[in-house]
Amino acid sequence: MTTTAERTDAPVRTDVRPGARRAFAILTGIATLFVFVQFFTSSEFIRSEGPSGETWTDIHGWTAYGLLAPALVAAVIALAALRRAAPVLTVLSVVLVVASVGQWGSGHLISTYHLDGWTAFHVFFSSVVLALAVWISVRSALIRRRG
């Protein structure tokens, strides 16, 4: 039986270009940063009323693209360059994009079409996106340092 302290991760394959590992780590870090920006802006528009609340809602909507774009590019890099070296990370990168699109879409259903029933779904996806983004970001940094 191995404990957490005894367990070691599988080595990173050396045939993965350092540039791919670095780009993936940077992009997942940027996506994670925008997840936190999303949380900040959501707390601001929930607290604000009137024009100020609408402004924060607009900012919240636009910063979603700051999450989606780097997450999508990171998933493409993972599929192209990291899938054999880090298969779990690759799959979770794709799941992050899918969850982010679900969060983005539900946000638009709420803000554009005023379908407030989607709020619980949107909040659930935000938790999934946060957990995935942080985990992927930490793991990508570890892979980059080991490689």
What are these regions (language model features)?
Residues 2-147:
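Polytopic transmembrane helical bundles with strong interfacial aromatic enrichment
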